[in-house]
Amino acid sequence: MKYKSIFKLCLLTTFLSVATISCDDWTEMEIHDSQVNGFKEQNPQEYAVYTQNLRAYKATKHAVVYARLDNAPEVSTSEKDFLRALPDIVDIVPMRNAARLSEYDREDMKLVREDYGTKVLYYIDCTAKDKLNTSITSAVETVRAGTFDGIALGSEGSAVDVSALKPLLDALGQTPCLLVFEGTPSLLPEAQRSLFNYFVLDISGASDEYDIETSVFYATGYGKAAPDRLLLAVTPVGT
């Protein structure tokens, strides 16, 4: 009995020694350089065909897909904070923090503009009166430089005075670009409405089809906007 106990103790000691050594081996980490290749790198030919067809589709008359991006957040929580995470089919994306583009933003903008044919816009908050002139100057400079495809104006439901629009339109001059207003057309001076390519109507608060029809009727009737210039939008819950 004594020998058996000693034998068992020896086995246990041996096991613990092996386990300790094994654990030491497991906790020794080695760092290896690795690169994750996407569709473009894995199959360049198929990628080229896909993106060519995508750009061709976006050049045709179709239902325009519009999505805002709160880029360059103070703290990034997931891929949703980056332009590359948006569906390829998106046509127009205003960058809500266009004044502070990150290097990731610039890389993603190059990708979606060149490969997907996506239009990326400089977003201006017209309610920030103290920053409006600076925003207009920066927006015009970046559009002229080719960094952005156009400008999106937001007013949070407030009317935009002609004094705010005139500096922007004068500075742009004949520069070809896309102009989008996030709001119903009647919030803009009537003389400047025709200069905008699209008006984004937020119908998040609509409770039924009647509310949506009323918003559209108000924009086309009182706002005098062509129906094909209206984009109906909703803000997803939880964003």
Predicted regions and their residues:
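Bacterial Sec-dependent N-terminal signal peptides
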Residues: 1-59
